Regions:
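Post-Walker A helix-loop "phosphate-sensing" segment adjacent to the P-loop in P-loop NTPases
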Residues: 174-185
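Conserved nucleotide-sensing/catalytic segment adjacent to the nucleotide-binding pocket
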Residues: 196, 200-249
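A short hydrophobic beta-strand->loop->alpha-helix junction that borders the nucleotide-binding pocket
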Residues: 185-191
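Walker A/P-loop nucleotide-binding motif
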Residues: 149-169
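Interdomain "pre-motor" coupling segment immediately N-terminal to P-loop NTPase/helicase cores
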Residues: 59-115
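N-terminal pre-Walker A segment at the start of P-loop NTPase domains
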Residues: 119-148
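Intrinsically disordered, low-complexity N-terminal extensions of AAA+/P-loop NTPases
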Residues: 1-51, 55-59
Length: 300
């Protein structure tokens, strides 16, 4: 069944005006030329072409993804003629989306990560690092952390909350990932919550533990802030640290506690062999990393 929809005079006039504007449009003229089409093509496909021009015009003065007004963020409408001569619409990444994809390409090297999307954009050469490095205390921590990259031993970065420890370690992670190393960035308190939530899912736990054991580079962020039990200490952290120490795998830590304070944190009251278990954890942390203090005011 065919439908013949009759336009009003006003609608006919508007359509004719739109077609006239389309024929004069530089983008339409270029499209016709590239595809060896004549003006009749505009008349037959005016609706699609009009929407395409609106999309192209919206992108023309765009300042970036944060200002995108397209239906799908970062995607521009494109047109092509298929082998049968029919006009097809499709979406393609705009220049800003392509740039963002390039900036995030190293994300595929992360085996396990609690980093946000914007965290993957952190670069050790960012102005934020360079400005912060003007502060004497931050410069020392930044320099020692970056200097650890070619060495076997990582860094145990400790200090008060908000001094920029996690931010610096995320930059370190991105550096390794961009240099083709497998990386895991783990917020220890969040990790423990997730493992408790999936306590009965042995497959999930084993998969996560393997990521932590075997990533080329591991960052244990905010260690000591988790809800500490014998299970979290002896069944989660110790096997990971033991594996990485034995295989001399690059490991970093951030904490609000010094190593000495962390040792006290892991001594659980009224539990057998507490001192020995705590010492075993700290022995591995000391073997895997060098303590570096990041003091100063909060940078949040």
């Amino acid at each position: 069944m065919s439908l013949n929809i009759k336009l009003s005079e006003e609608q006919m006039l508007e359509r004719q005006q739109n077609i006239a504007r389309l024929k004069e449009n530089e983008w339409i003229q270029l499209f016709l030329e590239q595809n060896h089409l004549d003006a009749s093509f505009v008349e037959e496909n005016s609706g699609v072409l009009l929407q395409w021009i609106k999309s192209v015009s919206a992108c023309r003065n765009c300042k970036g993804l944060d200002y995108c007004v397209q239906k799908i963020r970062g995607k521009a409408t494109k047109l092509k003629i298929d082998d049968s001569g029919f006009l097809n619409e499709y979406y393609a990444s705009c220049q800003y989306e392509q740039k963002r994809d390039q900036q995030l390409a190293h994300q595929s090297k992360f085996r396990f990560s609690h980093m946000s999307l914007n965290d993957y954009l952190i670069d050790l050469n960012d102005a934020s690092f360079l400005n912060a490095a003007k502060e004497k205390d931050y410069m020392a921590a930044y320099t020692q952390s970056v200097s650890s990259i070619p060495l076997n031993q990582g860094v145990y970065l400790y200090g008060n909350p908000g001094t920029g420890k996690s931010y610096l370690m995320k930059g370190i992670c991105n550096y390794y990932a961009k240099n083709n190393k497998s990386v895991s960035f783990v917020q220890v308190p969040l990790l423990i919550q997730e493992l408790k939530q999936f306590m009965t899912d042995n497959e999930y736990r084993q998969r996560v533990m393997n990521h932590l054991r075997y990533s080329d580079v591991l960052v244990l962020d905010d260690i000591g802030a988790e809800s500490i039990t014998q299970w979290t200490r002896d069944e989660i952290l110790l096997p990971v640290l033991d594996e990485r120490m034995n295989k001399q795998m690059k490991t970093y830590f951030t904490s609000n506690y010094s190593m000495e304070e962390l040792e006290q944190q892991y001594r659980l009251a009224n539990k057998p062999n507490n001192t020995i278990a705590s010492l075993r954890i700290l022995e591995r942390i000391r073997t895997l990393s060098k303590p570096v203090e990041l003091s100063g005011k909060s940078r949040r």
